[in-house]
Each structure stands twice: as structure tokens, then as C-alpha cells.
Swiss-Prot record:
Record's subunit section: Probably part of a corepressor complex containing ZNF304, TRIM28, SETDB1 and DNMT1; leading to promoter hypermethylation and transcriptional silencing. Probably associates with Polycomb group (PcG) complexes; leading to trimethylation of 'Lys-27' of histone H3 (H3K27me3). Interacts with USP28.
Xref: CDD domains: KRAB_A-box
The protein's role, per its UniProt record: Acts as a transcriptional regulator and plays a role in gene silencing. Probably forms a corepressor complex required for activated KRAS-mediated promoter hypermethylation and transcriptional silencing of several tumor suppressor genes (TSGs) or other tumor-related genes in colorectal cancer (CRC) cells. Also required to maintain a transcriptionally repressive state of genes in undifferentiated embryonic stem cells (ESCs) by inducing trimethylation of 'Lys-27' of histone H3 (H3K27me3) in a Polycomb group (PcG) complexes-dependent manner.
Similarity comment: family membership: Belongs to the krueppel C2H2-type zinc-finger protein family.
GO BP annotations, alphabetical order: angiogenesis; DNA methylation-dependent constitutive heterochromatin formation; integrin-mediated signaling pathway; negative regulation of anoikis; negative regulation of transcription by RNA polymerase II; positive regulation of angiogenesis; positive regulation of cell migration; positive regulation of epithelial cell proliferation
UniProt name for this protein: Zinc finger protein 304
The species this protein was found in: Homo sapiens (Human)
Keywords of the record: Activator, Angiogenesis, Chromatin regulator, DNA-binding, Metal-binding, Nucleus, Repeat, Transcription, Transcription regulation, Zinc, Zinc-finger
This protein's encoding gene: ZNF304
Length: 659
């Protein structure tokens, strides 16, 4: 194109014709298959850029004027008001994609309030100069679409500028949604057939009808699609077909990067960012941006599930959900990641996965600024700020912020352990627990403490261990002020104050505050001792008991008193010892007011008041309040004298033995 025209062109007004390249039949046949695919990809990319930009030009107030410039046989008509070039071509096949872009521009123009230009003999108003020229030719009696080869031209407007609102027919006063609809209506009303082919002199009311007729008249299709074998009149229509095969999504949302096939889908999507909500559920008050989302949501209240899977019988409220579910049975994964080759059954899953490679996190929390790659993760995160826990356990009334947490919690009541270790056959209620357990068999300890070099199989175990070095106890009980290094330990501790004991033993009816305590307790009934010492073969019902026992063999005493330097094999023994230095006696007897440094000492003391003697001798039936007293008594029956005095010797010892 001439440099003068390029300089004069308004930069913000972009047409797809500016970036589209036409091929004749002869030129197309010279291209190799790879070159044709390259042509398709380049044209699709150009179309995506034009469709995404969507620039428009505001009408000016000057009186209308026209300028014409001839460039390589193409008549360029420029209107001063719009600042746009309208191209007048020799007869070509109408381009459906360009027509779609025009309709898109007109649709977007319906949302804008721009001043329109008034021209012509009948003082009608037009938003597009192409429509103005078409209308003028009705007054002049000209045919606007003419397919002859003698140079007669027609105005083909595909400029993506967006002006105006309504299109009104002056003859009948009828309002139509776009200029093409108005033009078609007027030609029908006036009995005008403005599109004529010179070979047969047949006229048509629409350019698309002329184009179809020309293809029938010529009896040949010039361009074929390799994907489906169909033939087309021009490269533009071929490109339209190939867009379908290529799954083109030319409309991109700039804030989050999502892409869509249609402009209407992009407009609906943008309501998410604007916060526009117009459809509210009367049952629960939940609001939705789109009406069809509300209708889908309402099926949850009615419980209707019309779509049933023929493989497993599972029912769904939506057909698309059923289609997605059926891919579980077929194993279909048609969406491949171009970076790592990983395949997915849903395009949405692929989009989410690709954000791992790009690092994109489009969903940002407006409270703390933290960003997420998935919207559902943001929703879950925001519940930390709001404190919302919408998922309630019907058994114990406990609330959860995520449905997955409720499902995991529900297994406590049902006892379900769906995850099995293939090595030892052990079952687990959580998949994460199974993964951690497998490291026992593999011996994998990939997480190493930088302070002491100790290795762990789980990252969270390493994090918990590192608190030993820092001494941090960030989790404090609001009732008693006691601090803990782990949040779950604080939660367990708080049950002491609330008295909550939701876990019941099915054998004896005893209740426990923690599920782990119930599991350990049940070993009393079963007699299970799964933890064996590899030194002496002694078995224990608790893993912690085995660890303490092994220190007898190793001599390890890791817990040292900072006051006197005395060392102990367990932290509980050290805590009890420190009370000697502090004089703390926190456990008080409610009967006599006596204080004790250890809870076990208080329990033994209370038996003095209650007279309880739970330890009974199996030989004579004598009962004792302490197990140590029973053990000492039983030696009288066995004759065992384990402790011999070697301090005395000589005649005195001999005389004592005689006695």
C-alpha cells in the first residue's frame, strides 16, 4: 500500500482486511501443505488480534466530506467524519468472518452512546459509512452488490469501529437490531434485488445469496479443507472452516487471560471481574451472574438428576457433567499440555495446569493480596477471612470450610479406610496418610534438617521438628494461656476445656477426645502390640512406648534439665523433674486440699478418700490401691527375693542366715 495512504490512515481503526491475505486459485495450488497450515495459523492469529483489540472511532462534528485515493486498482473512499477508509473491490465472494466481525462491532456499538452523523436526502441516520453508501444507492437506483467482471464494485465494510445504537426503517417505523438487518428489510420492502450477476442477470436481495449462486453457477470450489475434505469458494471461507477444527478462541479476557470462542461469552465472563450480579436464588439467597447458572444451581434444591451414567448408574443434574464423568470410564484425555505432555479430560483442567508453567495467578484476594491460579482455591482461602464454614457434619454438628474436609471427617464416624498399602495391606482413611506410610517401606527421607542433619519422610514433619531448634510456640490457648508449637496440638488441648469427647469405643462405651486415643485404647480389647523392639523382641501397643524403650538399649537421654543437668529419656519425665526446682504443685485434691506436682500422684492420693483398690491378687484375692504394692505382695507367694544385701559378712552374716 502506498506510504501516503498509510500515513493518512487513522491508526485506532483496525480492519481485518488490513491483515488478511487473499490467494487466487493458481497461487493456492502452488502452496505446499505445510505452507497452507502456516497461512491458516498466521491468519487465525491476526484475526484474534483484531477481534481482541476491538478499537472504535468517535464521530466528529465536522460536515461530511469524502476523499478518494486509488491504490493498485482498489478504490479507497474516506469519510472525514469517521476518519475511515471504505474499500470498494471488484466482485469477490463475501467473507463470512468479516461479516461476523461487522455484526460484532454493531453489537458492541449498542452499548455505547456516541453521536451519529446525519446525511443524505431523507435525513436518515447511520452509524457505518458502508450502510450510508448502500442507502444512497437505493435512492440512485444502483445495485450495491454486483458480480460482474467489468469493474462494477460494491462497498464491503468490515471496519471494527463501534458507533451508534438503533437502526430504524423510515418506511414502516420498524426498529431492527443491526444495519444488515435494516438493509435486508428495506430491500424486501422496496422489492429491490440489489445483487445481480451479469452472466445470467439474476438479482438477489443479499450478497450472501449472490455468493452462493456464483458458486453454483461456476460449478467448482476452488479451495479444499484438508481436515474434513470440504471445498470452498475462497481462502476466507476455508479459514472459517479451519477455525472450527483448530478450536480457535480469539476473544481474550485481559485481566485473567481466559479465552473464548465467541464475543458474547467474553462479555458474560467480564461480569465476574466487574462483580455484576443480577440473578438471586429464592431458596438460599445465593447470587449468580448468569441466568443459566442460577437454573443449574436450583437443581440442587429440587434434587433432580435426569442424566444417568450407563456404566455405573451415577446420576447427574447436568448433561455436560455426565459427559465429563463418562470420560472416567473411557479413559479419554483429549487435552494435552504442550509443555510437559500431560493429558486431561477437560479443557478447564488443562488451562489450570498450564498456569503451573506460566506462573500465572489471576485470582487475587482483596483482603490480603495473596494470588491463586484457581478460582475455587481463592474461594476456599477467603473463608479464612470471613470465618465461613458452610459444610456441617450431620453426626456431630462440626462445621468445615471445605467439602473435602467434611468428607475426610465423615470417615471418623463411618470408620472407612479406602486407601490400602499394596506392600503390607494396611488401610488408611486419607490418601496423604498412605503416601507418608509408603515411605516406611521405601526408606525415603528426602527432607533434611539444616541444623542437626536429621532426615524426615514428610515435609510437615521437618517443619514441626525445626520448631525444637527455634523454640517457637505460636499457638496459644485462650483459656489457660498454654502455648503449643503445632496448631493440631492446640486443637486437641482445647478439648480439655470444652470436655468434648466425640469418639466412642464400641466395646466398652468409653469416650475419647481424639481418634488416635480411641485407636490406641481399642488395642486393650484386641491385645494388639504392633510395635516390636528389634533388639530384644519386646512388643508395645504404642509407637511412642517403643521409642522410649529403645533408649534403654542405646542409653540416650536427650532431655536435659537446665537447672541441674540431670537427663531423662522422655520429655514428660523432664517436665515432672522441673517441678522440683520450681516447687509447682498444680494438682489439688478436692477432698482435703492437698497439692501434688503430678496428676498421677493426685489420682493415687484420691484412692485414700474413695477406698478404691483396683489391683487384686489372683492368688489370695487381696486388693491394693497401687500396682507396685500388688507386685511386691505377689513375691510372697512366689518366694522371689530379687534384692540381696551383700554389705554384711563374717560371723554376723552367718548367724543371720541361721536364723
Amino acid at each position: 500500500m502506498a506510504a501516503a495512504v498509510l500515513m493518512d490512515r487513522v491508526q485506532s481503526c483496525v480492519t481485518f482486511e488490513d491483515v488478511f491475505v487473499y490467494f487466487s486459485r493458481e497461487e493456492w495450488e502452488l502452496l505446499e501443505e505445510a505452507q497452507r497450515f502456516l497461512y491458516r495459523d498466521v491468519m487465525l492469529e491476526n484475526f484474534a488480534l483484531v477481534a481482541t483489540l476491538g478499537f472504535w472511532c468517535e464521530a466528529e462534528h465536522e460536515a461530511p466530506s469524502e476523499q478518494s485515493v486509488s491504490v493498485e486498482g482498489v478504490s479507497q473512499v474516506r469519510t472525514a467524519e469517521s476518519g475511515l477508509f471504505q474499500k470498494a473491490h471488484p466482485c469477490e465472494m463475501c467473507d463470512p468472518l468479516l461479516k461476523d466481525i461487522l455484526h460484532l462491532a454493531e453489537h458492541q456499538g449498542s452499548h455505547l452512546t456516541q453521536k451519529l452523523c446525519t446525511r443524505g436526502l431523507c435525513r436518515r441516520r447511520f452509524s457505518f459509512s458502508a450502510n450510508f453508501y448502500q442507502h444512497q444507492k437505493q435512492h440512485n437506483g444502483e445495485n450495491c452488490f454486483r458480480g460482474d467482471d467489468g469493474g462494477a464494485s460494491f462497498v464491503k465494510s468490515c471496519t471494527v469501529h463501534m458507533l451508534g445504537r438503533s437502526f430504524t426503517c423510515r418506511e414502516e417505523g420498524m426498529d431492527l437490531p443491526d444495519s444488515s438487518g435494516l438493509f435486508q428489510h428495506q430491500t424486501t420492502y422496496n422489492r429491490v434485488s440489489p445483487c445481480r450477476r451479469t452472466e445470467c442477470m439474476e438479482s438477489f436481495p443479499h450478497s450472501s445469496s449472490l455468493r452462493q449462486h456464483q458458486g453454483d453457477y461456476d460449478g467448482q470450489m476452488l479451495f479444499s479443507c484438508g481436515d474434513e475434505g470440504k471445498a470452498f469458494l475462497d481462502t476466507f471461507t476455508l479459514l472459517d472452516s479451519q477455525m472450527t477444527h483448530a478450536e480457535v478462541r480469539p476473544f481474550r479476557c485481559l485481566p485473567c487471560g481466559n479465552v473464548f470462542k465467541e464475543k458474547s461469552a467474553l462479555i458474560n465472563h467480564r461480569k465476574i471481574h466487574s462483580g455484576e450480579i443480577s440473578h438471586v436464588c429464592k431458596e438460599c439467597g445465593k447470587a449468580f451472574i448468569h441466568l443459566h447458572h442460577l437454573k443449574m444451581h436450583q437443581k440442587f434444591h429440587t434434587g433432580k438428576r435426569h442424566y444417568t451414567c450407563s456404566e455405573c448408574g451415577k446420576a447427574f443434574s447436568r448433561k455436560d457433567t455426565l459427559v465429563q464423568h463418562q470420560r472416567v470410564h473411557t479413559g479419554e484425555r483429549s487435552y494435552d499440555c504442550s509443555e510437559c505432555g500431560k493429558a486431561y479430560s477437560r479443557s478447564s483442567h488443562l488451562v489450570q495446569h498450564q498456569r503451573i508453567h506460566t506462573g500465572e495467578r489471576p485470582y487475587k484476594c482483596n483482603k490480603c493480596g495473596k494470588a491463586f491460579s484457581r478460582k475455587d482455591t481463592l474461594v476456599q482461602h477467603q473463608r479464612f477471612h470471613t470465618g465461613e464454614r458452610p459444610y456441617e457434619c450431620s453426626e456431630c454438628g462440626k462445621f468445615f470450610s471445605q467439602s473435602s474436609h467434611l468428607i475426610e471427617h465423615w470417615r471418623i464416624h463411618t470408620g472407612a479406610r479406602p486407601y490400602e498399602c499394596i506392600e503390607c495391606g494396611k488401610f488408611f482413611s486419607h490418601n496423604s496418610s498412605l503416601i507418608k506410610h509408603r515411605r516406611v517401606h521405601t526408606g525415603a527421607r528426602s527432607y533434611v534438617c539444616s541444623k542437626c542433619g536429621k532426615a524426615f519422610g514428610c515435609k510437615d514433619t521437618l517443619v514441626q521438628h525445626q520448631i525444637i531448634h527455634t523454640g517457637a510456640r505460636p499457638y496459644e490457648c485462650s483459656e489457660c494461656g498454654k502455648a503449643f508449637s503445632r496448631k493440631d496440638t492446640l486443637v486437641q488441648h482445647q478439648k480439655i476445656h470444652t470436655g468434648e469427647r466425640p469418639y466412642e469405643c464400641g466395646e466398652c462405651g468409653k469416650f475419647f477426645s481424639h481418634s488416635s486415643n480411641l485407636i490406641v485404647h481399642q488395642r486393650i480389647h484386641t491385645g494388639a502390640k504392633p510395635y516390636e523392639c528389634n533388639e530384644c523382641g519386646k512388643c508395645f501397643s504404642h509407637n511412642s512406648s517403643l521409642i522410649l524403650h529403645q533408649r534403654v538399649h542405646t542409653g540416650a537421654r536427650p532431655y536435659v534439665c537446665s537447672e541441674c543437668g540431670k537427663a531423662y529419656i522422655s520429655s514428660s519425665h523432664l517436665v515432672q523433674h522441673k517441678k522440683v526446682h520450681t516447687g509447682a504443685r498444680p494438682y489439688e485434691c478436692s477432698e482435703c486440699g492437698k497439692f501434688f506436682s503430678r496428676n498421677s500422684g493426685l489420682i493415687l492420693h484420691q484412692r485414700v478418700h474413695t477406698g478404691e483398690k483396683p489391683y487384686v491378687c489372683s492368688e489370695c484375692g487381696k486388693a491394693y490401691s497401687r500396682s507396685s504394692h500388688l507386685v511386691r505382695h505377689q513375691k510372697a507367694h512366689t518366694g522371689e527375693r530379687a534384692h540381696e544385701c551383700n554389705s554384711f559378712g563374717g560371723p554376723l552374716a552367718a548367724s543371720l542366715k541361721l536364723v
